[in-house]
């Protein structure tokens, strides 16, 4: 730390202030500086945080998991879009070359549109909780991939923008902080 001796002719140095206009133009406000850095370096792996994890491929988020949000499997199987047996069979057949979702699409068991809709819903719901303020630092494991596979990669800026949009919406509807961390029902 550098100490600056202030005299009547020398004002103290200005403190850095975040430029909110520039943050808005970027599309993200720094919800997770670590995630922003990983996106900039186009990292592949998994970011594990207190409330879940985000899977990245080449700096884009391809999957998110949180115990507070329904996963892709539940969204696809809950209302008959896909049979639970078909999901389980594809998950068992998954290997390094064949992702679960690719097996379902190639087998004609799932349409690309239904998969993308459910995937984005599950990803954004889980990311909302994963990116919530945390009392512990996140950890990133390079090179880890998810067996579901990448359906539609989401840029980090879009993910953070959606997380902030959801926080703002929830705060406007119900300004009690207790609802911010409650699991989705």
Where in this protein do the model-derived segments appear?
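Acidic, Ser/Thr/Pro-enriched low-complexity segments and adjacent helix/loop capping patches
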Residues: 1-185
């Amino acid at each position: 730390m550098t100490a600056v001796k202030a005299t009547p002719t020398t004002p103290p140095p200005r403190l850095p202030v975040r430029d909110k206009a520039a943050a808005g133009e970027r599309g993200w406000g720094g919800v997770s500086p670590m995630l922003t850095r990983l996106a900039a370096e186009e990292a592949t792996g998994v970011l594990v945080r207190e409330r879940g994890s985000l899977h990245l491929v080449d700096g884009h988020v391809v999957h998110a998991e949180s115990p507070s949000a329904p996963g892709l499997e539940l969204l696809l199987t809950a209302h008959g879009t896909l049979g639970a047996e078909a999901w389980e069979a594809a998950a068992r057949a998954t290997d390094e070359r064949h992702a679960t979702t690719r097996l379902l699409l190639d087998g004609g068991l799932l349409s690309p549109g239904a998969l993308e809709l459910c995937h984005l819903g599950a990803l954004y719901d889980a990311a909302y909780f994963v990116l919530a303020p945390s009392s512990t630092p996140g950890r990133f494991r390079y090179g880890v991939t998810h067996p579901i596979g990448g359906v539609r990669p989401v840029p980090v800026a879009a993910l953070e923008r959606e997380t902030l949009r959801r926080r703002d919406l929830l705060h406007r509807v119900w300004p009690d902080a207790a609802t911010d961390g409650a699991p989705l029902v």
